[in-house]
UniProtKB/Swiss-Prot annotation:
The gene is uppS. Catalyzes the sequential condensation of isopentenyl diphosphate (IPP) with (2E,6E)-farnesyl diphosphate (E,E-FPP) to yield (2Z,6Z,10Z,14Z,18Z,22Z,26Z,30Z,34E,38E)-undecaprenyl diphosphate (di-trans,octa-cis-UPP). UPP is the precursor of glycosyl carrier lipid in the biosynthesis of bacterial cell wall polysaccharide components such as peptidoglycan and lipopolysaccharide. The active site is at D21, N69 (proton acceptor). Mg(2+) binds at D21, E208. This is Ditrans,polycis-undecaprenyl-diphosphate synthase ((2E,6E)-farnesyl-diphosphate specific). Homodimer. Binds 2 magnesium ions per subunit. It catalyses: 8 isopentenyl diphosphate + (2E,6E)-farnesyl diphosphate = di-trans,octa-cis-undecaprenyl diphosphate + 8 diphosphate. Substrate binds at residues 22-26, 38, 66-68, 70, 72, 189, 195-197. It comes from Pseudomonas putida (strain ATCC 47054 / DSM 6125 / CFBP 8728 / NCIMB 11950 / KT2440). Belongs to the UPP synthase family.
Length: 251
């Protein structure tokens, strides 16, 4: 991919979502075990956080572990859980020092109680920070998210607090795991695959999609800046024509 200039501040996405793909293939290419790729990917996470925070991005959501990833070999899943646990303990202080708030979305019930406790602790330590929000999607699936939002609304209807006809797309959106945050403007997937893999299905309705052939451990500062620059070059129409968008920009 050719080098491009960094995005101008006025065209920086408020919310960037990333599907971090390619860790296993990165490791396999180097004749290493899969977990080595996941460990190497932590450096890419740090690099992307740094670029996003400095560029004015408000929210970064990383797809760390999908609800379908439990189907992977037990050894790999176990290694991922250990890596997640150690990263939470190690990185929470670093995030707090940089005024970054950590949030974790997804169904936590399947995680070990110690890991759940580490999640709560890391969130609590960084809760008061306001420079930037790092959101980790763990045991998350877009279909699960929509279903749990529908269940919340159904309980409100059942309790007599809400009429079915009052349920709107906007109301349902507030019940999603990301309900209090801006919708993603840009979704990046690394690793050369062109799909969104059950990630933020509702939220990505109007997001710009950016696909990189780089494996996640190789997606660092320059790659992230290139993605932001590509976003800045696009015209977001939200169903309108180019002429309408341009006229609105001139008004």
């Amino acid at each position: 991919m050719e080098k491009t200039k960094p995005a101008a501040p006025s065209s920086v996405p408020r919310h960037v979502a990333i599907i971090m793909d390619g860790n296993n293939r990165w490791a396999k290419k180097r004749l290493l075990p899969g977990v080595a790729g996941h460990k190497a990917g932590v450096d890419a996470v740090r690099a992307v956080i740094e670029v996003c925070a400095k560029s004015g991005v408000e929210v970064l959501t990383l797809f760390a572990f999908s609800s379908e990833n439990w189907q992977r070999p037990a050894e790999e899943v176990g290694a991922l859980m250990e890596l997640f646990f150690s990263a939470l303990r190690r990185e929470a202080k670093r995030l707090d020092e940089n005024n970054i708030s950590l949030r974790i979305i997804g169904d936590r019930s399947r995680f070990h109680p110690e890991l759940q406790a580490a999640m709560r602790e890391a969130e609590a330590v960084t809760a008061g920070n306001n420079r930037f929000i790092l959101q980790i999607a763990a045991n998350y699936g877009g279909q699960w998210d929509i279903a749990q939002a529908a269940q919340r609304l159904a309980r409100e209807v059942q309790a007599g607090h809400l009429r079915p006809e009052d349920i709107t797309p906007g109301l349902l959106q507030t019940c999603l795991a990301t309900g209090d945050l801006p919708l993603p403007d840009l979704c990046i997937r690394t690793g050369g695959e062109h799909r969104i893999s059950n990630f933020l299905l509702w939220q990505l309705a109007y997001a710009e999609l950016y696909f990189s052939d780089l494996y996640w451990p190789d997606f660092k500062h320059e790659a992230m800046r290139n993605a932001l620059a590509d976003f800045a070059s696009r015209q977001r129409r939200f169903g309108k024509t180019s002429e309408q968008v341009e006229a609105g920009a001139r008004a």
